[in-house]
């Protein structure tokens, strides 16, 4: 279940190893956010009335990883040191629902109730999005409900490499 490798291929410690789901549909999986900096922005869109779920857009930030030559070029050209990924409304809600306390079936049901035909087929679309977030190293799958082994909330910089955001529209609390 554990790949043991991070976003850029470096070996991760055992307590932060990305969990992988071994094939098939994600039935019974508990998707859980890994420690990554994220925040909310914008007005609330459609969302279920649940704790920790706002319906706002989610912005993910993580340090850019460069090869030696790319790093030299980035410093010379003063390129950005981080990547920002703003999720759309459906993926933002999916992100907020992935706290490790809801299983895949519950999440799909909530997405379907919220977005109706916009997200059809909900199971396939949710699975594709979750697998992509897993591949990027932002999310893991557990066979059991998450026991809060690591922080999953907004504003956490596990790398210690990100600058404090100057964008006042980002809510990382």
What are the functions of these language-model segments?
Residues 1-34, 76-173:
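Long, charge-rich, low-complexity alpha-helical segments
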Residues 55-60, 71-74, 93-95:
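Short acidic/polar alpha-helix capping motifs at helix-coil junctions
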Residues 62-84:
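Alpha-helical membrane-targeting segments
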